[in-house]
Amino acid sequence: MTALQTIAVAFAMFSALPMPQFDWNEKNMRYALCAFPLVGVVCGALWCICGVLPLPAAARAAGFCLVPVWVTGGIHLDGYADTCDALSSYGDTAKKLEILKDPHCGAFAVIRLCSYFAAYFALCGCVAFTPRVGVLWTLALVGERALSGLAVAAFPLAKNTGLAHTFATAADRVRVRQVLAVLYAMLAVGLTALGGWALVLAAGCVFARYYVVAKKQFGGVTGDLAGWFLQKCEIWMLAALAACQWLGVL
């Protein structure tokens, strides 16, 4: 029962899918970050369904683009927008953290979101769906969430409040780090075996930059930064996937 509740906690927090109502406690939150990658399985499955439907190219690209947003409810995009606003302020750490708490959407966030969706839609239009590509992208969607959870459990926290702090302090951080690190290593091996080494490379580069930006600009990670990372990781892996197909290596 605790395992099912743990999965439900992860889906209730990181997706828009309806979940049973129950009290969150130390037991069912301890490994919620380990269940977070399962949201990627749902995104990948729906992405594959969109890929096999007899849709016009533009409609299929739109479906590819919108599936993650529909499943997650835009929680990661919200963090991406807030972080873009904070980084664009060029203020000190305290100023950036204050902007992250601001519920309003600034001009830079709107500009970055419009640019993000334009690029994402274009890249989706460049991807030709095949069963192999479907498996690759599903593994990638699971992997980016494993890295995101790993960062929350391993990186320093920017503040002692907020979503990242709540999940990090509730977690068995050592065990969560071990589980997610092993999971991502297995996913990386699977991606590489299927010819998706470029996606692994892209994710690794974004993950490294995430650590540098989080520590240098904000003093550590926050929930908003976790969302920013996930969206950046996703679009760069998508670019790597499109590039591999264009170059004929997939």
State each model region's role:
Residues P18-W24, I75, K95, G149-K159, ...:
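C-terminal ends of transmembrane helices
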Residues A185-Q231:
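Terminal transmembrane helical module of multi-pass membrane proteins
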Residues M29-L46, A86-R132, L136-W137, R175-G190, ...:
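Multi-pass membrane catalytic core of lipid/isoprenoid biosynthesis enzymes
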Residues V9-A12, E26-G51, H165-T169:
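N-terminal beta-alpha supersecondary unit
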Residues V67-C105, V213-C233:
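Acidic (Asp/Glu-rich) catalytic motifs at the cytosolic membrane interface
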Residues A146-L180, F218-T222:
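Solvent-exposed interhelical
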Residues C34-C84, V135-L139, G196-K216:
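Membrane-embedded alpha-helical segments that form the functional core of polytopic membrane enzymes
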Residues M1-W24:
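Membrane-proximal soluble regions of multi-pass membrane proteins
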